[in-house]
């Protein structure tokens, strides 16, 4: 509704990702977009805007701590994502600063990062939520695009190197993908070898991410799959 049809965004886009579609509507080709935000800077009407902002760890902690008095007594901070350990130095600094403030800390991870990332962040965590989708590497590759060897190695190494750090392992149950009795039994057998396993949680499938795929112009690979 804010677009005035000036087409400044299409002129500013270096890759041609922003283009005029049928009916004169501006459409962004997500595959061609480099997220340079030249179109946003050129938009004088505010029809295009950037979501999010870059902050250093100190500023972010200050903003969070400004709300600290409204937390419940058991409140704390959990780093989630995306994958927070994709920025291991930033994640470690955030966690350390929160611990220095006396705030409880936790971290959610898919585990597909260099183990050095865990070594940086784990000393400042009080709990880690670790996703383990399946044990079969071919199934994991088919549905996520990557092998799970690194994930399994990281989970075992993390539990052994930080035996006092509780691990809560979680498996999102996808009907027809990883919800078979044999598949779950393989996971349980592996988890029994972890020194610091605190809990194992099965998460029922949901399709809350379908709208995000639509906004990104991508097809949802599990379209038609109904939650239990």
Place the predicted regions along the sequence by residue.
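Iron-sulfur cluster-binding cysteine motifs and their immediate structural context
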Residues: 8-28, 38-53
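Conserved AdoMet/S-adenosylmethionine-binding subsite of the radical SAM
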Residues: 58-208, 214-215
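Short, intrinsically disordered, charge-balanced linker/junction segments flanking boundaries
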Residues: 1, 193, 225-228
